[in-house]
């Protein structure tokens, strides 16, 4: 018989809690997203994360851990070879990525790829380099509007991103070009993890702002995941934020797109008030997209505080047979050099009103304990070829 009727997994995108032993292999030394935010800001107003045990797990600044935490907590290492969104989320649901996705950070995309993209989209490509999304629209937005061209850029992640001004490029046309790019980059030598539409508005430099109409075109997971197993067993698998994009809709029964992380939490609170049996899987991207990549410590800290307020509302509404899991998919230390993700441990914090006391549980060597624990709870077998083991008995 299942222990929990509904499980809520909330991914605080990029909220890492310290460098993994192999982080230097990924170009990351002494990284610690949450720890360094606490160090810089000294205090954060996070009463709900505190009582769940976040500061017992990882403390810093002038903060104090809870005397009697109500959550069960540990840190998870990443077994996969990567530090990106897809690799992290796929691993949570049982897929270990051995071979990292193709990146084009150093020299941009090959001329052959760009030529094919220009031919099929009917637009000249400008940019074609690794850049911050906000900086590249400042640099090239006016040129794109004037000449009807198309800004293409990448990052240290395995992504091809296309910017389009909603007023002159047209949103549907931007999505069409991204669908073309997705097909082109299915070739092995150009195989990127995600193609992302990055729409923006504004007429001139200094006025350009990205909108919430972003859309991700991800590769399908390389195998079946815990999500497929849950859906195939007749359970609800509700996604909030970019989860549906990350899994290419695989294993999802209902999807909600979010305009922001605050909106994502509001959607989750609404879902909590409805009846369902299964999983609600949530990604809150603003920690990463707005603050981590932009190396904005204060913005990141304030985003955590905003999350904490809504976390308190959600916790009140949880039923006795609900389980809440908080985690992250990688790090993105806003105090570190560059603009890219950082290879870090992630938190695992579990809470239910029916739990008999909180405290530390054993550290785990993979994010995949999350998917394995969820399927175990519902008496569902994980698909062949997946990794991970259940820690349901510890919750």
Curated annotation (Swiss-Prot):
- Which terms does the record give in the GO molecular function aspect? magnesium ion binding; manganese ion binding; phosphopentomutase activity
* A GO cellular component entry from the record: cytosol
- This protein's major location comes to cytoplasm
Binding-site list for Mn(2+) 1: 13, 329-330
One Pfam family from the record: Metalloenzyme
Which Gene3D superfamilies did the record assign?
Alkaline Phosphatase, subunit A, Phosphopentomutase
What does the entry's cofactor note say about binding and number? Binds 2 manganese ions.
The EC number on file is 5.4.2.7
Q: What class of enzyme is it?
A: isomerase
Q: Which UniProt keywords apply?
A: Cytoplasm, Isomerase, Manganese, Metal-binding
Q: Which CDD domains match?
A: PPM
> Cofactor(s) for this protein?
Mn(2+)
> HAMAP family, alphabetically?
Phosphopentomut (MF_00740)
PANTHER family (UniProt xref): PHOSPHOPENTOMUTASE
Q: What does this protein do?
A: Isomerase that catalyzes the conversion of deoxy-ribose 1-phosphate (dRib-1-P) and ribose 1-phosphate (Rib-1-P) to deoxy-ribose 5-phosphate (dRib-5-P) and ribose 5-phosphate (Rib-5-P), respectively.
Give the similarity note: Belongs to the phosphopentomutase family.
**UniProt protein name:** Phosphopentomutase
Q: Please tell me the species this chain comes from.
A: Agathobacter rectalis (strain ATCC 33656 / DSM 3377 / JCM 17463 / KCTC 5835 / VPI 0990) (Eubacterium rectale)
Its ancestry begins with: Bacteria, Bacillati, Bacillota, Clostridia, Lachnospirales
């Amino acid at each position: 018989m299942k222990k929990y009727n509904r499980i809520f997994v909330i991914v605080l995108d990029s909220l890492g809690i310290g460098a993994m032993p192999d982080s230097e292999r990924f170009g990351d030394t002494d990284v610690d997203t949450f720890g360094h935010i606490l160090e810089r800001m000294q205090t954060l107003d996070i009463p709900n994360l505190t009582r769940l045990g976040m500061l017992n797990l990882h403390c810093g600044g002038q903060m104090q851990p809870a005397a009697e935490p109500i959550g069960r907590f540990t840190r998870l290492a990443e077994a996969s070879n990567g530090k990106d969104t897809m690799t992290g989320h796929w691993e949570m649901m049982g897929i270990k990525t051995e071979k990292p996705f193709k990146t084009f950070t150093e020299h941009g995309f090959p001329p052959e790829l760009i030529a094919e993209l220009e031919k099929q989209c009917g637009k000249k490509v400008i940019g074609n380099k690794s850049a911050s999304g906000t900086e590249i629209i400042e640099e090239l937005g006016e040129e794109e509007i004037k000449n009807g061209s198309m800004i293409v850029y990448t990052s240290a992640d395995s992504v091809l991103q296309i910017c389009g001004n909603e007023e002159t490029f047209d949103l549907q046309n931007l999505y069409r070009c991204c669908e073309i790019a997705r097909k082109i980059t299915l070739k092995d030598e150009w195989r990127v993890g995600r193609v992302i539409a990055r729409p923006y508005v504004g007429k001139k430099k200094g006025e350009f702002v990205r909108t919430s109409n972003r859309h991700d075109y991800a590769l399908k997971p390389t195998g079946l995941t815990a999500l497929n197993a849950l859906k195939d067993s007749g359970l609800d698998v509700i996604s909030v934020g970019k989860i549906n994009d990350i899994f290419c809709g695989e294993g999802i029964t209902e999807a909600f797109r979010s305009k922001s992380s605050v909106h994502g939490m509001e959607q989750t609170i609404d879902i909590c008030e409805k009846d369902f049996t299964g999983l609600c899987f949530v990604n809150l991207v603003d920690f990463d997209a707005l603050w981590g990549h932009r190396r904005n410590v204060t913005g990141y800290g304030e985003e955590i505080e905003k999350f904490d307020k809504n976390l308190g509302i959600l916790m009140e509404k949880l039923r006795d047979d609900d389980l809440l899991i908080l985690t992250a998919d990688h790090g993105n230390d806003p105090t570190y050099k560059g603009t890219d993700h950082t290879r870090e441990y992630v938190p695992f914090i579990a809470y239910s009103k029916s739990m008999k006391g909180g405290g530390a549980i054993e550290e785990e060597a993979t994010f995949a304990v999350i998917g394995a624990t969820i399927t175990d709870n519902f008496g569902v077998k994980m698909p062949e070829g997946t990794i991970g083991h259940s820690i349901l008995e510890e919750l």
